[in-house]
Design a protein with these regions (language model features):
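Catalytic machinery of carbohydrate-active enzymes
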Residues: 1-333
Length: 333
């Protein structure tokens, strides 16, 4: 039996996309034992994943000593193959502890991204995706498995009970207004206008999801049909909430990618990021809303770069009516 290590330490969206690669690794090596290396703060995402035989977490707060300890530990596991689908400084340090001929690392399009962000020249092929990039390590470039995450029966039961206690039925839309970087957030006015239209047209319950830092959630209008769960769910519970939603709406953020991996289509509003940075949907019923005609986007890998124009047109030119028409079509499929 082969022992295989897959490395993807962060961030939430990229870890979700990595589950497609895990499926392919298992298909290619059906009798293998698969270990997955991830940052400690993200480990809950792939907990209970049936393909992962062992989850190894890394605590970056412990610094280089922890990295060296981890490298020695990985070496002692005697892996037959190591797939590094992250390719950052930390994973290169880890590679020093592992046999070079067994270590397979993705080649990131760093030069193309630099030219895109700072020279405004797009040399990416139309079909580029992070999932496709990961699969180059397996020699695959055509069709790829869908991303998948899992919660167990106990978690499903707890989610259903939690929804009942908040009087949330089956007819609800999950909205994730926050993002790691404010530049990726759609405006609160647009969210509130959209929510009013959805309630008026579909009588849907709107469930707001977010963490402590997502202050935009506090600015959502109050209404009998709006249930604001900001900071009231664990990540695992939020996974259950999006699983049972009719639809999920948000920007290029972790819970949007999680929603698709749980089988719920999303409408993803893209501003400073794009498919060239890994922001794209995977389900056929999901939608991307973006302004493709702007010369300045995408402007950074994760949306962290402050906008240098007088207005952030990639977001301000997407109005609530455009998003509403896309969501309403998705709800009536």
């Amino acid at each position: 039996m082969k022992k295989i290590l897959v490395i993807r330490m962060s961030a939430i969206g990229d870890i979700v996309l990595a589950t497609s690669f895990l499926e392919s690794v298992k298909q290619k090596y059906p009798d293998s034992e698969i270990h997955f290396l991830i940052k400690k703060e993200f480990s809950d995402i792939v907990k209970k994943h049936p393909i992962i035989d062992k989850l190894i977490s890394f605590d970056k707060k412990l610094g280089l000593n922890e990295l060296f300890r981890l490298g020695k530990f990985l070496r002692s596991n005697n892996y037959d193959i190591i797939f590094d689908i992250h390719s950052v400084f930390r994973t290169r340090v880890l590679s020093l502890f592992l046999r070079k001929n067994l270590f397979k690392q993705i080649k990131k399009p760093r030069l193309r991204r630099f030219l895109l962000f700072y020279g405004y020249k797009n040399y990416f092929e139309e079909s580029f995706s992070h999932i496709k990039m990961y699969h180059t390590l397996l020699g695959q470039d055509k069709t790829f498995p869908q991303t998948n995450l899992y919660i167990d029966q106990l978690e499903e039961d707890k989610t259903k009970q939690f929804l009942r206690e908040d009087n949330i039925g089956n007819n609800y839309i999950a909205i994730v207004p926050g993002a790691a970087w404010s530049q990726k957030q759609w405006s609160i006015d647009n969210y509130n206008n959209l929510i009013k239209k959805l309630i008026r047209s579909f009588n849907s319950t709107i469930v707001i999801l977010g963490s402590t830092n997502d202050v935009i959630c506090d600015k959502i209008i109050k209404h009998d049909k709006i249930i604001n769960l900001k900071d009231k769910t664990s990540l695992r519970m939020a996974m259950g909430v999006v699983k049972y939603a009719q639809h999920t709406l948000g920007s290029d953020t972790g819970l949007s990618h999680i929603s698709e991996a749980m089988g719920t289509p999303v409408t993803m509003i893209l501003g400073p990021t794009s498919k060239e940075t890994g922001a794209r949907v995977t389900l056929s019923d999901s939608r991307v809303i973006e302004n493709k005609d702007l010369w300045c986007r995408p402007c950074s890998q994760n949306g962290s770069r402050p906008c240098y124009r007088k207005e952030q047109y990639c977001m301000t030119e997407i109005d609530s009516e455009k998003v509403y028409s896309n969501v309403s079509r998705a709800l009536t499929l």
